[in-house]
């Protein structure tokens, strides 16, 4: 299109009146074209870099980027309009020099504003009352602080240059074409090459220096003043890696990349000075753009490893597996315990891949086994381009409100995955229920069922505060024999690994069953689907992160209210003997969930009593029993009577276990 514009005037342009203001001191056409190209390059370069740095502070939703773009475009338009009314009579060279010098200063000041971006955003958000409107308003205020003055000057400069190009043979069209060409190259030069090679601060200083270099002639006073401002900014703003870490976090390493700033931190929150903590390193976490915690070692290994083991164990004999999204790499590394499995792991951010070694020994398999291959790629494109089918595909916990992540929950993406599965393959999409509004969760489940109508739901682990649901879709629902685990798990390494993460028997694997297809269909109900042409998740999911007023267990409770899972339907006819135990296990698990929800809701006593009920339902589900023991230990000094009451009830519910009775006897001896 730029070439077509270059060939001549736009329709009707040659017939328009002469411009109101001619510039007798306008430079030659070649220099004008160079200025138009350069200012387009620098202007969009500043925008790309500004948005990239702000992404470390804002919520990174579609509204965050819309706010920045709105301010940028409105500022440019306003600057052009104001200049047409007030500055067009002042000739060409003097306004050009002034605008270029002011733009260099404005970009330098913008760099300083970016250094204070967190304070600006948090102050504005608090002043506006938070919530959805307040948060989006704060993002717009931050964008105004970063882009306001520079874009006004950019608009005025573009107006000046196009006015100088205005001729009867179509100069404005050529001006726009050349300026757009420079703008088109800016994301590659500044957002990729310079961002990767020098970092955001140096890249922004290069933008400011670029405007200085375009000044018509050397003026010692003007050049000196501009360079003094840029030097001051360079010294006063030490870094634009706006790391904002919890006081108990200790930075291990950080990388500033094209798309994100990635940090690895040690979490010393619960790491005291006792002997146990001296011998055990603190949990190590992966943090992206300050907001996204992508898992880590310590307690997080349990969840992340189960994300790999559970879907793989539900397949009879997986030979090829694909993992979409790596994070710390712990989930993908857990797949290395499955013998003869060849795995491909796909991660969008190269900076994340570069720090996976920081999570050893949990990720050691990625370095010791040639069966696990890591790819830096976009998950959607990798799925579309992959050739050989996979037996198991596992999609990680994508943050649904993050700009671009909504596309990973579309019908089209799910359908592309279905076509990539082997005939007996299965696909597991993990969902962070605590990061979703109920209506968004229903849209995702509805979209998944559109492609996998026989999908089932599975709990990754039994945490009511941060529940994680796996949607597992396959061509036809499987049924499992009572000795499934014994048949499936024969390698000692796999048996040890699965058992260490609570998946050491058929009962424990199938006991994660959460919802049958009919349960998911009843919960999701009728409504819109998330598609490429109707990306409702991208626009609705951010409401949750902006409001932050919904408890993590809300979706867990809503799904449990709609579902009545019958785990007996998972078993082959010959496995009927396991059905009563499996049913009791699921009932005890759900009772435990409800007990934890009561406690989290402030109903401590009622929740504790329900934990005792959970212990009494199934001897195979020990979590309720062990939780009550832990609570009773905490009550020993603060509320001895309550401790005795809980221990008596627990011993009555499960008398064959001796821990409650032993603790009760100790308390009675201490009278």
Q: Where do the model's predicted regions map?
A:
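Alpha-helical transmembrane segments of multi-pass membrane proteins
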Residues: 1-478, 484-487, 541, 546-548
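Structural register within alpha-helical repeat arrays
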Residues: 594, 628-631, 664
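TPR-repeat structural position
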Residues: 604, 640-641
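TPR alpha-solenoid repeat register
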Residues: 623-627, 660
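SAM/dcSAM-binding transferase cores
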Residues: 479-587
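Short coil turns that delineate tetratricopeptide repeat
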Residues: 619-622, 655
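Alpha-helical segment of the N-proximal tetratricopeptide repeat
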Residues: 566-567, 578-617
């Amino acid at each position: 299109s730029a070439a077509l514009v270059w060939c001549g005037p736009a329709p009707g342009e040659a017939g328009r009146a002469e411009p109101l203001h001619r510039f007798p001191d306008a430079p030659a056409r070649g220099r004008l074209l160079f200025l138009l190209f350069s200012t387009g390059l620098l202007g969009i370069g500043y925008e790309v870099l500004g948005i990239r740095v702000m992404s470390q502070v804002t919520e990174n939703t579609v509204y965050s980027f819309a706010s920045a773009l709105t301010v940028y475009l409105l500022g440019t338009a306003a600057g052009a309009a104001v200049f047409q009314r007030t500055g067009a009579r002042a000739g060409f060279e003097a306004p050009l020099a002034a605008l270029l010098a002011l733009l260099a200063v404005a970009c330098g000041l913008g760099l300083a504003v970016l250094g204070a971006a967190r304070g600006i955003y948090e102050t504005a958000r608090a002043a506006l009352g938070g919530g959805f409107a307040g948060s989006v308003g704060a993002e717009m205020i931050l964008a105004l602080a970063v882009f306001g003055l520079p874009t006004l000057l950019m608009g005025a400069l573009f107006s000046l240059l196009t006015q100088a190009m205005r001729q009867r043979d179509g100069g404005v069209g050529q001006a726009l074409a050349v300026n757009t060409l420079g703008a088109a190259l800016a994301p590659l030069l500044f957002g990729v090459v310079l961002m990767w090679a020098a970092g955001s601060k140096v890249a922004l200083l290069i933008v400011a220096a670029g405007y200085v270099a375009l000044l018509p002639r050397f003026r010692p006073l003007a050049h000196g003043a501009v360079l003094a401002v840029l030097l001051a900014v360079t010294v006063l703003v030490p870094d634009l890696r706006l790391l904002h870490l919890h006081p108990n976090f200790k930075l291990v390493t950080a990388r500033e990349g094209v798309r994100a700033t990635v940090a690895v931190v040690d979490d010393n929150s619960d790491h005291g000075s006792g002997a146990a903590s001296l011998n055990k390193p603190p949990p190590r976490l992966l943090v992206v753009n300050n907001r996204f915690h992508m898992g880590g070692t310590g307690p997080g290994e349990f969840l992340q490893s189960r994300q790999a083991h559970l879907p793989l164990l539900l397949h009879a004999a997986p030979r090829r597996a694909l993992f979409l999204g790596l994070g710390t790499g712990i989930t993908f590394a857990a797949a290395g315990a499955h013998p003869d499995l060849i795995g491909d792991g796909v991660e969008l951010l190269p900076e994340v891949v570069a720090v996976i070694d920081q999570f050893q020994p949990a990720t050691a398999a990625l370095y010791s086994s040639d069966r696990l291959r890591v790819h830096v790629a976009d998950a959607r494109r990798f799925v579309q381009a992959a050739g050989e089918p996979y037996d198991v595909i596992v999609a990680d916990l994508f943050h649904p409100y993050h700009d671009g992540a909504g596309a990973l929950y579309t019908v089209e993406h799910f359908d592309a995955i279905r076509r990539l599965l082997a005939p007996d393959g299965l696909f597991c999409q993990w969902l962070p229920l605590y990061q979703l509004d109920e209506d968004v969760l229903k849209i995702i489940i509805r979209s998944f069922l559109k492609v996998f109508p026989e999908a089932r739901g599975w709990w990754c682990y039994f945490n009511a505060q941060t529940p994680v649901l796996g949607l597992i879709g396959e061509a036809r629902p499987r049924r499992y024999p009572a000795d499934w685990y014994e048949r499936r798990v024969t390698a000692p390494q796999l048996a040890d690994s699965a058992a260490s993460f609570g998946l050491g028997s058929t009962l424990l694997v199938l006991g994660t069953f959460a919802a049958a297809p009919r349960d998911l269909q009843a919960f999701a109900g009728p409504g819109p689907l998330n598609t490429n042409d109707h990306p409702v998740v991208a626009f609705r999911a951010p409401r949750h992160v902006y409001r932050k007023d919904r408890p993590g267990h809300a979706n867990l409770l809503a799904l449990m209210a709609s579902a009545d899972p019958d785990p007996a339907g998972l078993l082959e006819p010959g496995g009927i003997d396991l059905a009563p135990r499996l049913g009791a296990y699921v009932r005890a698990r759900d009772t435990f969930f409800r007990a934890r929800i009561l406690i989290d809701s402030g109903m401590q006593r009622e929740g504790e009593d329900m934990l005792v009920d959970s212990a009494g339902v199934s001897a195979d589900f020990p979590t309720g029993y062990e939780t009550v023991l832990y609570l009773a230990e905490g009550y020993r000094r603060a509320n001895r009577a309550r401790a005795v009451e809980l221990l008596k009830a627990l011993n009555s519910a499960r008398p064959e276990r001796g821990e409650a009775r032993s603790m009760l006897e100790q308390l009675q001896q201490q009278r």
